[in-house]
Amino acid sequence: MDDPNSYDVIIVGTNLRNSILSAALSWANQRVLHIDENSFYGEIDGSLTLRDLEQINEKIKKVDSSQILNDNGSHKSPLKRFEVQFLNKDLIPKNKGSVIQFHPQEIFASSELVKLLSETKIYKYLLLKPARSFRLLTSNEEWIKVPESRADIFNNKNLSLASKRIVMRFMKFVSNIADEQNQNLVKEWESKPFYKFLEEVFQLSGAIEESIIYGLCQSLSKDIPTKDALDTVLKYFHSFGMYGDYSYLLAMYGTGSELCQGFCRSSAVMGGTFMLGQAIDKIDESKIVLKDGSTLSAKKIVSSVDEGKLPHQQIQQRYLLVKGDCQQLFQEDGFFAALDASLIHFSPFSISENFGNSVQAKLYGSGSGDCPEGYCIWYLKTLNDSPCNEVFNLATKKLCSFSGCDDLEIIVQVDETLNQLRHIDYDDTLHSAKSLFYEILGQNNTFLQREGLFDEDDE
């Protein structure tokens, strides 16, 4: 008889990489135990309710705020600081329909992750909605539309015919980037700043250059390497039009958290065992000792990845729960985009002549599932080497003015310092999970594949 406390693999932490790995191992008929000391899924990829936030606010009065994500010392948490302010408790929504994401991200419609969600039918556990890059405030303090497609370029009345031709030449280059001649050019420039590439190779400058670097690439500084930027722009253009007039998808109720739960649910369907809120005393190479004294063993133990070993940049992020009518923030050319999720970008020096980094704003309305009707959620982020409080306050004023609503009120404010991976999508996380899967089981095993189709009974 099998030992009930013995497994093929024990996974500690339910971040997205581990959740994907958990599903893949369970699909490969491995006996998997998945543990998380937190009471919620996702770790840094997860989300909190306002009730969770109130509990954490009490916890960080007693411990270092960077320790709110339990990690058992098994890895270095990417979350370095977490501060909560309830600015008007009387206006906090009474229902449970508000979430805060530790690290909100979108999914490119053309990404490998979306393909995997489709092939495995795990998308059935998610409610996916579109999101768009919307507006950018240039360094000349002019609001412009981010060019998401060729049609946007042709219809841009602020671009001369000569400028449109230059932009189209750049878009053609990106579309044919796999050509040998173009690859040689990319190799020459891959580690050099992207803005120099745009200026010297394509003679692009000014507002259109800013819209590419800070709009399409969501870069926080102008020094993004050329290869990273081109990879992002290529995904953006490939994604636009795949499912509609947008490039991004998000999952309702918190993208990262819902992705983690979707893969964990798939793992559980295939026999994986889960333990949330489970305190761990000690982790060895082949066993885990819980706080209650029980011991669990496995051929392989996987803990959350040490983010410090991966390329990252330290950022400041501010979460704001706002009460009021923010619909104009989702409006385009007089028509409501009906997305309730948009991205607004601030170029360097657009907020203040003393501030040389970009600020990125992700805005979610009630249609995203992240907040109730009559509220919206704003996420602002910039590099950590900035005077963040002043900059975020100025950006908030710009958004309030742009919203066209005179009676917006900020209810909750959360400030974070965290290490963010340099890429803005989830495919690197998928690659990491796949690499670890083959490291554990070998190259002869198939990753998230099995005979036959995914049956309705599996749900």
Curated annotation (Swiss-Prot):
Xref: Pfam families: GDI
Keywords carried by this UniProt record: Cytoplasm, Nucleus
One function term, GO molecular function aspect: GDP-dissociation inhibitor activity
Gene3D superfamilies with a match to the protein in the record: FAD/NAD(P)-binding domain (3.50.50.60), Guanine Nucleotide Dissociation Inhibitor, domain 1 (1.10.405.10), Guanine Nucleotide Dissociation Inhibitor, domain 2 (3.30.519.10)
GO BP: small GTPase-mediated signal transduction; vesicle-mediated transport
GO CC field: cytosol; nucleus; Rab-protein geranylgeranyltransferase complex
InterPro entries: FAD/NAD-bd_sf, GDP_dissociation_inhibitor, Mrs6
Localisation: Cytoplasm; Nucleus
Keyword Nucleus: yes
Signal sequence residues: none
Keyword Cytoplasm in record: yes
Sequence similarity: Belongs to the Rab GDI family.
PANTHER family per the UniProt record, alphabetical: CHM, RAB ESCORT PROTEIN 1 (PTHR11787:SF4), RAB GDP-DISSOCIATION INHIBITOR (PTHR11787)
Stated name of the protein: Uncharacterized Rab geranylgeranyltransferase C15C4.03
UniProt source species: Schizosaccharomyces pombe (strain 972 / ATCC 24843)
